[in-house]
């Protein structure tokens, strides 16, 4: 088992990251398969102690499925499912670490669902978040461009809905163009 892709991948994590992955796997939102939880629980002590002792697949199978005969195809499927969840965990870590991504996806979601009640609070929180960003690399301006574009889409969507230009009339076309230009120049240089 130690030569499998999932085991080798999990070996790269620190104990802290392994604990976070364990919490991720325990979440019913991300994982509804209790056998995957069991598999990880069996692997965790070996991973945390960095033991070189081999883990026979048949022994692990016997712990997870005590009443069933070893089935290599099902065991590989279980390992593959754990690997997919691990990949999802890695992506989730990046998402959680980037509040601008989160704000951008939130604005997209509000726009696609046409949830007018959240418009003002989300736009103001996005503006506060943008103002607090210290790093202003070219990717920052790309995300700013996306945020401004989503704000524009939200604003124009609600103006269409109410057929008036009072509450949402501050269109941000100049900001959209400015952020896209800065991103382009930053990438070009």
PLM-predicted stretches and their roles:
Residues 1-189:
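Extended alpha-helical scaffold regions
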């Amino acid at each position: 088992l130690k030569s499998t892709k999932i085991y080798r991948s999990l070996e790269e994590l620190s104990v802290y990251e392994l604990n976070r992955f364990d919490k991720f796997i325990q979440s019913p939102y991300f994982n509804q398969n209790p056998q995957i939880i069991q598999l990880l629980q069996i692997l965790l002590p070996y991973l945390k102690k960095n033991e070189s002792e081999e883990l026979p697949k048949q022994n692990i199978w016997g712990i997870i499925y005590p009443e069933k005969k070893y089935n290599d195809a099902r065991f590989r499927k279980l390992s593959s499912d754990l690997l997919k969840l691990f990949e999802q965990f890695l992506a989730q870590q990046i998402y959680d670490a980037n509040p601008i991504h989160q704000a951008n996806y939130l604005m997209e979601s509000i726009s696609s669902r046409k949830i007018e009640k959240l418009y003002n609070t989300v736009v103001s929180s996005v503006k506060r978040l943008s103002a607090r960003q210290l790093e202003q690399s070219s990717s920052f301006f790309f995300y700013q461009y996306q945020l401004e574009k989503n704000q524009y889409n939200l604003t124009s969507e609600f103006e269409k809905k109410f057929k008036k230009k009072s509450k949402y009339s501050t269109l941000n076309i100049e900001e959209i163009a400015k952020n896209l230009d800065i991103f382009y120049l930053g990438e070009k240089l």
